[in-house]
Amino acid sequence: MPKMKTCKSARKRYAFTSKGKVKYKKQNLRHILTKKSAKRKRNLGKSGLVSNVEVKRIKTLLPYV
């Protein structure tokens, strides 16, 4: 049976914590930052956690993590 392939786009976007949770970097912090408030930019800089509903789907995209 052939090896399962890792979804390369998912590999770049998600990282697993030691307890098995999935974290990601939030969007909207690349350009057009002048109209965004300091509070919004500060919160966008923090990494977020994926909800438990979507973790199973991400694990199918990343079989060897």
From Swiss-Prot:
This is Large ribosomal subunit protein bL35. The keyword Ribonucleoprotein applies. One of its GO terms (biological process) is translation. GO terms for cellular component: cytosolic large ribosomal subunit. One of its GO terms (molecular function) is structural constituent of ribosome. Gene3D superfamilies: 4.10.410.60. PROSITE patterns: RIBOSOMAL_L35 (PS00936). Keywords: Ribonucleoprotein, Ribosomal protein. PANTHER family: 54S RIBOSOMAL PROTEIN BL35M, LARGE RIBOSOMAL SUBUNIT PROTEIN BL35M.
